[in-house]
Amino acid sequence: MSGGVIVVGAGLAGAEASWQLVRRGVPVVLYEMRPRKCTPAHKTGDFAELVCSNSLRAEALTNAVGLLKEEMRRLGSLIMACADAHRVPAGGALAVDRQLFAAAVTERLTSHRLVTVCREEITTIPTAELVILATGPLTSDALADELRRLTGQEHLYFFDAVAPIVTLESIDQDRVFRSSRYGRGDPAYLNCPMSREEYERFWEALVAAERATRHTFERETHFEGCLPVEVIAARGRETLLYGPLKPVGLVDPRTGERPYAVVQLRQDNRAGTLYNLVGFQTNLKWGEQRRVFSMIPGLEQAEFVRYGVMHRNTYINAPVLLSPNLMLKSRPGLFIAGQLSGVEGYVESAAAGLVAGLNAARLYKGLEPLVFPPETAHGALINYIVTADPANFQPMNVNFGLFPPLPGKRVRRRPERNLAHAQRALERLAAWLTEKGEG
């Protein structure tokens, strides 16, 4: 096959898909509309720009996303290579300096001899034999309409919410303490402890705060993993104590006791000058954010360098439309990757791009596309999105509940059980890659 593969979108999924193609010797034409046309959330023209959080979540193999990242490393992932090279302290998680990370991904692809970058908006789906659509949760209206016409399915909409960022120097260090939960890993988080009285005042202000106006054409449907903090708070007076303000595993060194509630701040850049409010994705008006979030102990005089915003997320009904190799059932050769495919999260999006890129490369070379084994994190996640109930389909993060049961007697302790899943997955992946000639 001649002419190469067209990849639309240079986010995490499109960048990873492009890399998997060129590392197998397949030429790529990569379309990215930014910076000529930006989305409501993106600020730059860099590839793989992170707009919500700078965390790629847990590192340990006892966490499913940690396993997914390790599988990606073993599959030659560009996203993981750049993330590892530009990580910042985050305890047991992998967090990155978002600017250095995106710049590294951009440089690796734009400098590659097999990559042709086109900085323009695509409003119709290319008619080429091999196309990967990786336009992400903020797919332009024109392309979304085109995809709707092609699939015959209505898109589902919900809102992702972006957390605010404050400067380190504006945080009152006398009111916060540095620690990770249960003392695990580096003491990477700044913790703002609250007494019961402080929490009650904060909760009352939060639920009464004015929210930004949404577009009338968008329904308010939230993914549970990225709920706005005010939506969580509105579910009950104590709901936040089991969510972003949970105090478990933390002890205030000044009192020797666990606080009633804790707001965690996570380093957002390598220099350590910026911190984001963990779990504080929000749709409050900016003035309300300053008023309410300044009630958090230690943030009374905080300088907000970015306020939270909300934006639409668009994804297809994968159980109806997608094959397990991520090709559209109605049009062989057209792959859907990233959050558009119905996976949720940075790492999951990149992983879907990896699978789409690998399979597009195989088709380009006249080989059969592959379906990852369900025992692997890649296989378990994709198996879920293509087999879930189409009537109630929601985006999904990777988790061990998606994996086939372990053989033999059930392991009772969760860490040991999860580690057994991870060990099986990595062994199965290695054998499968060798078997398929992808090792």
UniProtKB/Swiss-Prot annotation:
Subcellular localization: Cytoplasm
Keyword flag Iron: no
Catalytic function, reaction form: uridine(54) in tRNA + (6R)-5,10-methylene-5,6,7,8-tetrahydrofolate + NADH + H(+) = 5-methyluridine(54) in tRNA + (6S)-5,6,7,8-tetrahydrofolate + NAD(+); uridine(54) in tRNA + (6R)-5,10-methylene-5,6,7,8-tetrahydrofolate + NADPH + H(+) = 5-methyluridine(54) in tRNA + (6S)-5,6,7,8-tetrahydrofolate + NADP(+)
Residues that coordinate or bind FAD: G9, A10, G11, L12, A13, G14
GO BP, sorted A to Z: tRNA methylation; tRNA wobble uridine modification
Gene Ontology cellular-component terms listed: cytosol
Database matches in InterPro entries: FAD/NAD-bd_sf (IPR036188), MnmG-rel (IPR002218), MnmG_N (IPR040131), TrmFO (IPR004417)
Swiss-Prot/TrEMBL keywords: Cytoplasm, FAD, Flavoprotein, Methyltransferase, NAD, NADP, Transferase, tRNA processing
UniProt key word Cell inner membrane: no
GO MF term (any one): flavin adenine dinucleotide binding
Family the entry assigns: Belongs to the MnmG family. TrmFO subfamily.
Role noted for this protein: Catalyzes the folate-dependent formation of 5-methyl-uridine at position 54 (M-5-U54) in all tRNAs.
Entry-linked HAMAP family: TrmFO
Name this polypeptide is given: Methylenetetrahydrofolate--tRNA-(uracil-5-)-methyltransferase TrmFO
